[in-house]
């Protein structure tokens, strides 16, 4: 076994989830990630935790969605989740476009059926990570070996140092009222974050981490945004997304590629037309775009926003939590002709923060 796999497992178990004696641990991994499953099970055994292994197959998931006429909440899965302390989930499918021929309305119906079960999982200790596979390497335009280096380097940085760097932005956002994002001629978006909390992502729920994220006040988002980096969702690429918000809600949308898939996402439920997250990428160690949101949203010089559900921990007691069966992140490249303003003050210009060397106020 590659020693980096054991290091990855140790980071998940110790830093990300804190697995300890008596914990029940669900390990959900694709077949390609068996070595990571083995390493995690060894750690569980050493610590006196009880693991349950779930194998995730994209082909099986596709087959079920295409064959079913309707979906119901999986009560057996909910029962398992209620008895679970820790979830470890790794991506790493052989074919990243496996679900491309599942209809958008089918995905929406399935997501609505499992929404409550997903919320149960999110209420526990959990970590979503990546296992490097040839399929993801191909999507990133990299050799398998180079992609393995990329992934294992990204998950093994000094998270204490990274967290201290990000804490400078958390301090700025914590007492802030309003954020404005401007980029080029097509993005000018304003939102209130008053009363909400900025979270410092240091590789716990997401590994790798490397962002600061919060939630907009639900009805406050106003303006237009052009997400100029593409994303993969349900096995298909969505590119050139443009959204217009009024009173927090998406009132018009367009995409250069797979607009009908974007439409299906926005029509999932009432909450899927509202923003649930504003995230600011701060991980300078992730220095290339790979068509994998787990990494891409953490890149420095980027901002991402998610239509759909908000993370409850980011929403203050006096504000409403946006609820949705969807949570779809999309990215704006902030490296050129771009600013982030907080309460009227520029805190980032062209990807450089006010607390970094090289920042130019104007």
Can you say where each PLM-predicted feature lies in the sequence?
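Metal/cofactor-centered catalytic core regions of large enzymes
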Residues: 34-35, 46, 130, 134-362
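Active-site bordering "gate/hinge" segments
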Residues: 1-222
């Amino acid at each position: 076994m590659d020693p980096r796999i054991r290091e990855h497992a140790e980071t998940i178990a110790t830093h990300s989830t804190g697995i300890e004696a008596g914990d029940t641990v669900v390990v959900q991994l694709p077949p390609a990630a068996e070595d990571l499953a083995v390493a995690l099970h060894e750690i569980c055994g050493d610590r006196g935790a009880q693991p349950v292994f779930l194998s995730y197959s994209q082909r099986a998931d596709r087959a079920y969605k295409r064959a079913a006429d309707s979906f119901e909440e999986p009560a057996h899965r909910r029962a398992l989740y209620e008895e679970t302390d820790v979830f470890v989930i790794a991506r790493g499918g052989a074919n990243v476009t496996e679900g491309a021929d599942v209809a958008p309305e089918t995905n929406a119906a399935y997501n609505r059926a499992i929404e409550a079960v997903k919320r149960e999982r999110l209420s526990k200790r959990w970590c979503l990570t990546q296992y490097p596979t040839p399929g993801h390497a191909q999507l990133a335009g990299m050799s398998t070996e180079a992609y393995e280096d990329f992934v294992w380097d990204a998950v093994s940085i000094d998270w204490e140092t990274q967290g201290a760097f990000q804490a400078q932005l958390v301090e700025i956002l914590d007492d802030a009222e309003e954020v404005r994002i401007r980029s080029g001629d097509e993005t000018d978006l304003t939102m209130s974050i008053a009363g909400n909390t900025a979270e410092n992502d240091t590789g716990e729920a997401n590994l790798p981490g490397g962002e600061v994220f919060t939630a907009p006040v639900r009805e406050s988002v106003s303006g237009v945004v052009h997400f100029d980096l593409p994303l993969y969702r349900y096995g298909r690429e969505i590119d050139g997304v443009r959204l217009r918000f009024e009173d927090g809600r998406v009132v018009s949308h367009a995409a250069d590629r797979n607009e009908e898939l974007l439409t299906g996402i926005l029509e999932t439920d009432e909450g899927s037309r509202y923003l649930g997250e504003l995230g600011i990428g701060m991980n300078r160690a992730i220095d290339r775009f790979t068509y994998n949101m787990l990494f891409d949203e953490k890149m420095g010089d980027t901002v991402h926003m998610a239509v759909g559900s908000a993370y409850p921990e980011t929403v203050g007691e006096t504000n409403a939590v946006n609820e949705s069966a969807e949570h779809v992140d999309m990215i704006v490249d902030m490296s050129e002709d771009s600013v982030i303003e907080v309460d009227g003050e520029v805190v980032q210009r062209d990807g450089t923060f006010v607390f970094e060397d090289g920042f130019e106020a104007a």
